[in-house]
Regions:
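Vicinal oxygen chelate
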Residues: 1-4, 9-17, 61-70, 72, 86-103, 105, ...
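Short, flexible, solvent-exposed loop/turn segments with mixed acidic/basic and small polar residues
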Residues: 1-4, 84-90
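Long, hydrophobic N-terminal alpha-helical segment
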Residues: 1-48
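Hydrophobic pocket/interface hotspot
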Residues: 22, 26, 97, 107, ...
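Conserved short beta-strand elements that form part of the metal-binding/catalytic scaffold
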Residues: 33-85, 127-148
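Short solvent-exposed loop/turn micro-motifs enriched in small/polar/acidic residues
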Residues: 7, 55-57, 122-124
Length: 153
Protein backbone atom coordinates (compact mmCIF):
# COMPACT_ATOMS: atom_id res chain seq x y z
CA UNK A 1 0.00 0.00 0.00
CA UNK A 2 1.35 3.41 -0.93
CA UNK A 3 1.35 6.47 1.31
CA UNK A 4 -1.38 9.10 1.16
CA UNK A 5 -1.40 11.68 -1.62
CA UNK A 6 -2.60 14.23 0.93
CA UNK A 7 -2.36 14.62 4.68
CA UNK A 8 -4.64 17.51 5.57
CA UNK A 9 -7.59 19.56 4.34
CA UNK A 10 -6.79 23.22 3.77
CA UNK A 11 -9.66 24.70 1.74
CA UNK A 12 -13.14 24.03 0.39
CA UNK A 13 -13.75 25.75 -2.95
CA UNK A 14 -17.38 26.55 -3.78
CA UNK A 15 -18.43 27.98 -7.15
CA UNK A 16 -21.32 30.46 -6.87
CA UNK A 17 -23.45 32.55 -9.21
CA UNK A 18 -23.76 35.63 -6.95
CA UNK A 19 -20.88 36.23 -4.54
CA UNK A 20 -22.55 38.89 -2.37
CA UNK A 21 -25.81 36.96 -1.95
CA UNK A 22 -23.91 33.78 -1.08
CA UNK A 23 -21.73 35.56 1.49
CA UNK A 24 -24.86 37.03 3.14
CA UNK A 25 -26.43 33.56 3.30
CA UNK A 26 -23.29 32.00 4.78
CA UNK A 27 -23.07 34.82 7.36
CA UNK A 28 -26.77 35.03 8.26
CA UNK A 29 -27.70 31.35 8.16
CA UNK A 30 -24.45 29.66 9.18
CA UNK A 31 -22.41 32.29 11.03
CA UNK A 32 -19.46 31.91 8.65
CA UNK A 33 -17.25 34.99 8.37
CA UNK A 34 -15.64 37.49 8.34
CA UNK A 35 -14.86 37.44 4.63
CA UNK A 36 -12.00 38.86 2.61
CA UNK A 37 -12.76 39.73 -1.01
CA UNK A 38 -10.48 39.79 -4.04
CA UNK A 39 -10.60 39.79 -7.80
CA UNK A 40 -8.25 37.26 -9.34
CA UNK A 41 -7.13 37.64 -12.94
CA UNK A 42 -5.23 34.60 -14.18
CA UNK A 43 -3.31 34.43 -17.44
CA UNK A 44 0.09 34.61 -19.05
CA UNK A 45 1.68 36.54 -16.17
CA UNK A 46 1.24 33.57 -13.83
CA UNK A 47 1.51 30.83 -16.47
CA UNK A 48 -2.16 29.88 -16.06
CA UNK A 49 -3.13 26.70 -17.94
CA UNK A 50 -6.29 24.61 -18.16
CA UNK A 51 -5.74 21.06 -19.41
CA UNK A 52 -2.25 22.11 -20.52
CA UNK A 53 -3.42 25.03 -22.67
CA UNK A 54 -2.73 28.70 -21.85
CA UNK A 55 -5.89 30.56 -20.84
CA UNK A 56 -7.07 33.77 -19.21
CA UNK A 57 -9.74 33.74 -16.52
CA UNK A 58 -11.20 36.25 -14.08
CA UNK A 59 -13.00 35.46 -10.85
CA UNK A 60 -14.18 37.27 -7.77
CA UNK A 61 -13.55 35.36 -4.57
CA UNK A 62 -14.48 35.65 -0.92
CA UNK A 63 -12.52 33.77 1.71
CA UNK A 64 -13.28 32.97 5.35
CA UNK A 65 -11.62 30.54 7.73
CA UNK A 66 -13.64 28.18 9.91
CA UNK A 67 -11.90 25.78 12.29
CA UNK A 68 -8.61 26.11 10.43
CA UNK A 69 -10.18 25.36 7.02
CA UNK A 70 -10.43 28.10 4.40
CA UNK A 71 -13.79 28.47 2.63
CA UNK A 72 -13.32 29.98 -0.82
CA UNK A 73 -16.39 31.21 -2.70
CA UNK A 74 -15.66 31.69 -6.41
CA UNK A 75 -17.80 33.72 -8.82
CA UNK A 76 -16.58 33.33 -12.42
CA UNK A 77 -16.55 36.63 -14.29
CA UNK A 78 -16.16 35.14 -17.75
CA UNK A 79 -18.28 32.56 -19.53
CA UNK A 80 -15.47 30.10 -20.13
CA UNK A 81 -13.16 27.93 -18.10
CA UNK A 82 -13.46 25.27 -15.47
CA UNK A 83 -15.38 27.36 -12.93
CA UNK A 84 -17.85 28.77 -15.47
CA UNK A 85 -18.46 25.29 -16.93
CA UNK A 86 -19.02 23.86 -13.47
CA UNK A 87 -21.53 26.63 -12.74
CA UNK A 88 -23.35 26.04 -16.05
CA UNK A 89 -23.44 22.26 -15.61
CA UNK A 90 -24.08 21.97 -11.86
CA UNK A 91 -25.58 25.31 -10.90
CA UNK A 92 -22.78 25.82 -8.38
CA UNK A 93 -21.63 24.00 -5.27
CA UNK A 94 -18.45 22.39 -3.98
CA UNK A 95 -15.97 22.37 -6.85
CA UNK A 96 -12.70 21.44 -5.18
CA UNK A 97 -11.03 20.60 -1.91
CA UNK A 98 -7.50 21.91 -1.38
CA UNK A 99 -5.26 19.51 0.48
CA UNK A 100 -1.78 19.55 1.94
CA UNK A 101 0.43 17.09 0.14
CA UNK A 102 3.80 15.79 1.27
CA UNK A 103 5.09 15.81 -2.33
CA UNK A 104 3.59 18.44 -4.65
CA UNK A 105 5.82 17.44 -7.56
CA UNK A 106 4.84 13.78 -7.39
CA UNK A 107 1.11 14.61 -7.09
CA UNK A 108 1.32 16.77 -10.24
CA UNK A 109 3.48 14.24 -12.13
CA UNK A 110 1.01 11.47 -11.35
CA UNK A 111 -1.90 13.61 -12.57
CA UNK A 112 0.00 14.40 -15.77
CA UNK A 113 0.70 10.70 -16.39
CA UNK A 114 -3.00 9.91 -15.95
CA UNK A 115 -4.29 12.91 -17.98
CA UNK A 116 -5.80 14.28 -14.81
CA UNK A 117 -4.14 17.70 -14.57
CA UNK A 118 -6.96 20.24 -14.93
CA UNK A 119 -5.26 23.49 -13.93
CA UNK A 120 -1.77 24.72 -13.21
CA UNK A 121 -0.59 28.21 -12.30
CA UNK A 122 1.48 30.32 -9.95
CA UNK A 123 -0.26 32.75 -7.62
CA UNK A 124 1.42 34.87 -4.96
CA UNK A 125 4.56 32.75 -5.10
CA UNK A 126 2.72 29.44 -4.71
CA UNK A 127 2.47 26.78 -7.44
CA UNK A 128 -1.11 25.49 -7.66
CA UNK A 129 -2.60 22.51 -9.47
CA UNK A 130 -6.08 21.04 -9.75
CA UNK A 131 -6.10 17.25 -10.02
CA UNK A 132 -9.08 15.65 -11.73
CA UNK A 133 -10.02 13.13 -9.04
CA UNK A 134 -13.77 13.40 -9.66
CA UNK A 135 -14.12 9.80 -10.84
CA UNK A 136 -12.37 8.38 -7.77
CA UNK A 137 -13.15 10.92 -5.03
CA UNK A 138 -16.21 12.75 -6.39
CA UNK A 139 -14.43 16.12 -6.21
CA UNK A 140 -11.42 17.91 -7.71
CA UNK A 141 -8.34 18.08 -5.46
CA UNK A 142 -6.24 21.24 -5.36
CA UNK A 143 -2.61 20.83 -4.34
CA UNK A 144 0.04 23.49 -3.91
CA UNK A 145 3.67 24.07 -3.11
CA UNK A 146 4.01 26.19 -0.01
CA UNK A 147 1.07 27.74 1.80
CA UNK A 148 -1.87 29.31 -0.04
CA UNK A 149 -2.74 32.79 1.11
CA UNK A 150 -5.93 34.77 1.03
CA UNK A 151 -7.20 35.05 -2.51
CA UNK A 152 -5.68 31.77 -3.67
CA UNK A 153 -7.54 30.38 -6.69
Amino acid sequence: MRGPVFDGTVQIGVVVRDLEATVRRYEDDYGIGPWQFARIDLGEANDYREYGEPAERSNRVAIATVGGVMWELIEPLDGEGIWARFLAEKGGGVHHVAVATPDFGEAVARAEREDGLMLRCEHSGVDIAYLDTRRDLGVVLEVFSGTPGDGAP
